[in-house]
Regions:
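Inter-lobe coupling/hinge region of RecA-like P-loop helicase motors
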Residues: 1-5, 165-172, 193-260
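Conserved RecA-like helicase ATPase core segment
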Residues: 121-222
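Conserved active-site motif detector
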Residues: 436-557
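Conserved helicase NTPase motor core
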Residues: 1-5, 32, 60, 64-154, ...
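Charge-dense polyanion-binding interfaces
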Residues: 86-92, 281-312, 519-557
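Core RecA-like ATPase module of SF1/SF2 helicases and allied nucleic-acid translocases
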Residues: 38, 178, 247, 258-414, ...
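P-loop NTPase Walker
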Residues: 1-77
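Short glycine-/polar-rich loops that comprise or flank the Walker A/P-loop
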Residues: 26-30, 57, 131-133, 140-141, ...
């Protein structure tokens, strides 16, 4: 099934799962659904519970990796996920897996365009082991934006070429107004390799608005930055929404606004600009190298669970131990700005697991990402990279596109994903020519020389800090909390109270800071974003982990 954006893919899939179980006499143990993220697996489980109640608990909805770790008989995490899918496929093909563990009559694959060579090998092995098995693969080749990690929509195409296969296109868009859909169709024609051939059709009678605002790349050899005009757009939208709310007759539910960028750095700079104008905004970004289960708050909670169940032989975590672990963790980390991520994760785990199996908790924690638990519901604005906006929708979308001269299909698909997130209005601020030919859009030219914001924020990731520097300071670091201020000096971060250095930036980050300093910026503040567990991959197995600080550096002109 080639499901276009806004076609109700998730709803259709959930209803199909319910139909298989209730109307088509498929037993729950014969049904397997595979997804590419823990967040997707959780969403399907939640929606299925709303539809069929407790019966949803018995349906196997797994990520490719967790299913394969199950077959290999071990719990894994994202760091160890490397060859696990490939190994599982080989074991199935070699007859090394008990037939009853892989005996399925229906296999459902979500986001099938994201399959890699190993994922497709697993699907092929399951098909070979279950000759009568039905496979329902749903995806959109135009939304394959993970080529960098090996995914390729050609594997979805190969499924369409298998014997007795049927190819269905879901082309009705229930999300976006007409001009937005027409513009997205126009743009998609630039993508060279496509499976879908039928244009998407908007189910709305309203036109909507698409604006392409073109900016010069530079004026008098000085680069033009597009943050300020996006801020001005946001201010206008917020003013417009406020006046609508004041008029009770035309009042709508809170309308959502999102700013989509290509890079994390752009997203963080945009966020800082919004905050400097007292606009509430939340950031959803890719957090390279940061694993949810390595957060200090998560590790402490797991430690309390481990201590509590040591005496019990039950695979299920008793409610009193669960509640005690929560209370102790919430109390210890009450001032931590990272605590909401843990709170939200536990809330979701409680909703989707009737019995709290210890193995399920570990799998849930190991497979989750920090950004899975970012609550964007109470923000005026969501600032996000395009990658992290996939699967979401907003009333208004503003895109910041500094595009390359020769965009690849991968880049074009990324822009297509961003464009199709919006329901009502799309505004693209760009300094290139890629969007010039879009007929359904209003084209504007803004010749103003916008400068960089006076304040920027740099978020340090693992590669931006000297990881070994923090080893001797583990105890001191574990006493700190996310959100606490630090003092920056000579490429080091220290505790304001004692002056003790606890972190140092990497050589690469020193060079980056040097470039900002040459533009007139200097670090004026620093604060802890996350405290995380870390150990070198080359370290001996018995070596203890270090605690490292990932901080935000505020720079001003």
């Amino acid at each position: 099934v080639a499901a276009g954006p806004g076609s109700g893919k998730t709803r259709v899939l959930v209803h199909k799962l319910a139909s298989l179980l209730l109307l088509e006499d498929v037993k729950h143990e014969q049904l397997l659904m595979l997804t590419f993220s823990r967040a997707a697996a959780t969403e399907f489980k939640q929606r299925l519970m709303q539809l069929i109640g407790n019966a949803a608990h018995f349906v196997e909805i797994k990520t490719f990796h967790s299913y394969c770790f199950d077959l290999l008989g071990r719990v894994g995490n994202l760091d160890e996920a490397g060859d696990v899918v490939k190994q599982a496929a080989e074991m199935i093909n070699n007859g090394e897996v008990e037939p009853n563990r892989i005996s399925k009559t229906v296999l459902v694959i979500d986001e099938a365009q994201d399959m890699s060579k190993d994922d497709y090998a697993l699907v092929s092995a399951l098909m070979k082991a279950n000759e009568e098995m039905r496979v329902i693969a749903v995806g959109d080749d135009d939304q394959n934006i993970y080529e960098f990690r090996g995914s390729n929509s050609r594997y979805l195409y190969e499924l369409t070429q298998t014997e007795h296969s049927r190819f269905i296109e879901m082309t009705e868009n229930y999300r976006s107004l007409r001009h937005i859909v027409d513009t997205a169709n126009d743009f998609a024609r630039n993508i060279r390799q496509r499976i879908k051939s039928t244009p998407i059709i908007s189910m709305s009678q309203e036109d909507g608005e698409v604006r392409i605002v073109k900016h010069p790349y530079e004026i008098q050899e000085k680069k033009v930055y597009m943050y300020q005009p996006i801020l001005e757009d946001v201010t206008r939208l917020l003013g417009s929404n406020a006046s609508k709310e004041a008029d009770a007759s035309s009042r709508k539910k809170n309308e959502t606004i999102s700013i989509l960028t290509q890079t994390n750095e752009e997203a963080v700079i945009m966020l800082a600009l919004l905050h400097s104008h007292n606009i509430k905004a939340k950031l959803v970004q890719s957090m390279d190298g940061l694993r949810f289960w390595n957060l200090a708050e998560v590790r402490y909670f797991l430690k309390k669970i481990d201590q509590g169940i040591k005496e019990t032989k039950s695979p299920i975590i008793p409610d009193d131990i669960w509640e005690a672990a929560k209370q102790q963790t919430f109390q210890k980390y009450a001032t931590s700005q990272a605590l909401p991520y843990l709170r939200r994760s536990l809330q979701i785990f409680e909703q989707t697991n009737r019995a709290k199996y210890y193995s399920d908790l570990r799998e849930f924690v190991f497979e989750s990402s920090v950004e899975d638990f970012c609550d964007i519901s109470k923000s005026d604005i969501v600032v996000s990279t395009i990658h992290k906006a996939k699967g979401h929708e907003f009333d208004y979308v503003l895109m910041l596109i500094t595009h390359p001269e020769h965009p690849t299909d991968d880049i074009l698909r990324r822009y297509y994903v961003g464009m199709t997130r919006t329901k009502r209005t799309l505004a693209i601020h760009t300094n290139g020519n890629l969007f010039d030919s879009l007929k359904s859009a209003q084209h504007l030219y803004d010749a103003q020389a916008y400068d960089e914001p006076k304040e920027i924020v740099l978020q340090l990731s693992h590669k931006d800090v000297n990881l070994g520097f923090s080893k001797p300071h583990k105890d001191a670091i574990l006493c700190l909390r996310s959100g606490m201020p630090l003092t920056y000096h000579d490429h080091c971060l220290c505790l304001p109270s004692t002056g003790r250095d606890i972190a140092q930036v990497s050589i690469k980050m020193k060079e980056k800071l040097g470039k900002w300093e040459m533009k007139g910026y200097k670090v004026t503040a620093a604060r802890i974003r996350f405290i995380v567990a870390w150990k070198s991959k080359d370290a001996p197995r018995d070596e203890k982990e270090s605690a490292i600080v990932l901080a935000d550096l505020v720079m001003k002109k």
